[in-house]
Design a protein with these regions (language model features):
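Short, helix-capping/interhelical loops that line the mouth of catalytic, cofactor-
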Residues: 52-56, 111
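Active-site loop segments of alpha/beta catalytic cores
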Residues: 31-33, 39, 60-306
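Serine/threonine-rich low-complexity intrinsically disordered regions
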Residues: 19-43
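Short amphipathic beta-strand/extended segments with alternating polar/hydrophobic composition
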Residues: 39-53
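Short, solvent-exposed loop/edge-beta patches enriched in aromatic
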Residues: 1-5, 24-26, 91-92
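Segments that shape or occlude catalytic/ligand-binding pockets
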Residues: 1-20
Length: 306
């Protein structure tokens, strides 16, 4: 699978906020407003994740005046002509997915992890629910419009980075309360149009959110980061059985060690792949210190696992 080969609508804030430099600080760093309305600290020439300085989505007034108008559905969010032409261009042998959007991860992008926490606990859950519902309703309408064009897809794919190395960035109970209906609504729509593989991209330790996803139609985990916390796919298989599929789950730190470490990882991948419904691969980028000859060796040997 090439999981980047998905097609979708414009389901972001539209129009986005103006991307502009608000202030240049004495150390040369800049406070920059992004298209999501967050204020980031950026150092020119430094390629890294910028720190979050501030955000606009702080209360109901900001939501209703600044954000809600940008979350509205309109037909031009979908390039209908492009999707109608997709079936005529299906001369490739790779699967094509429909992008199913994000229920909460993109909202976390809009208000930062800190801001999301304050919105829930210092403002009120009703406001946060209104934000989730407004954004989700627009996305659903776009996805439905795409499928109604007759374009054929092999899988659906969510993006939902809402976990980190210690688990979810939000209470699993509240996450389920706010998001379950929106996952089910979209996965039911996928089933209606013959799409039975629905994957979800979430980094970090996802175990506590799996019940929400699996019980509402998501059946494929990605990228199954190993990180510092270890394997997550085998426990998921033990709990949910073969209805949970996986893409990822390879411990890429083996590339920094030796051939024996890669062989051990290949053996672990082979056991998982032998059950079916699992495609091994490393997550994201390879780490500094990785040995290219070990990557080459893995790339050849992993084919034997599939």
């Amino acid at each position: 699978f090439n999981w980047s080969r998905t097609a979708g609508a414009n389901i972001d804030l539209s129009p986005g906020f103006e991307h502009k430099v608000l202030e240049t600080l004495p150390d040369g760093s800049q406070r920059v407003q992004t298209w999501t309305g967050t204020i980031e600290r950026v150092t020119p020439g430094v390629v890294s994740i910028p720190s979050e300085d501030d955000y606009l989505l702080k209360d109901r007034a900001a939501f209703e005046e600044l954000y809600l108008p940008k979350m509205q559905y309109f037909e031009d969010r979908v390039n209908v002509g492009y999707f109608k032409s997709l079936n005529d261009k299906r001369d490739w042998d790779l699967p094509l997915g429909i992008f199913l959007g994000s229920v909460m991860g993109k909202i976390r992008d809009m208000c930062t992890v800190t801001g999301m926490s304050y919105l829930i606990y210092d403002e009120d859950e009703e406001l946060f629910a209104d934000i989730v519902n407004a954004y989700a309703d627009m996305q659903y309408k776009c996805i439905k419009q795409i499928l109604e064009t007759g374009a054929k897809f092999d899988f659906g794919h969510f993006w939902e980075d809402i976990c980190y190395k210690n688990g979810p960035l939000i209470s699993p109970e509240l996450f389920d309360e706010l998001t379950a209906e929106h996952y089910k609504r979209r996965t039911d729509l996928c089933k209606e149009y013959g799409i039975d593989i629905v994957s979800l991209d979430c980094d970090g330790v996802v175990e506590k959110l799996l019940p929400t996803w699996v019980n509402n139609g998501v059946n494929t985990m990605f990228p199954i980061e190993i990180g510092v916390w270890g394997d997550q796919f085998y426990p998921a298989r033990q709990k949910f059985g073969n209805k949970v599929l996986g893409v990822g789950g390879m411990d890429k730190t083996a590339f920094r060690r030796d051939k024996a470490a890669v062989d051990a990882e290949l053996e672990r991948m082979k056991r998982l792949a032998s059950e079916g419904g699992f495609i091994p691969c490393p997550d994201h980028r390879l780490m500094p210190g990785s040995k290219f000859e070990l990557v080459q060796y893995y790339a050849e040997e992993v084919k034997k696992c599939l």
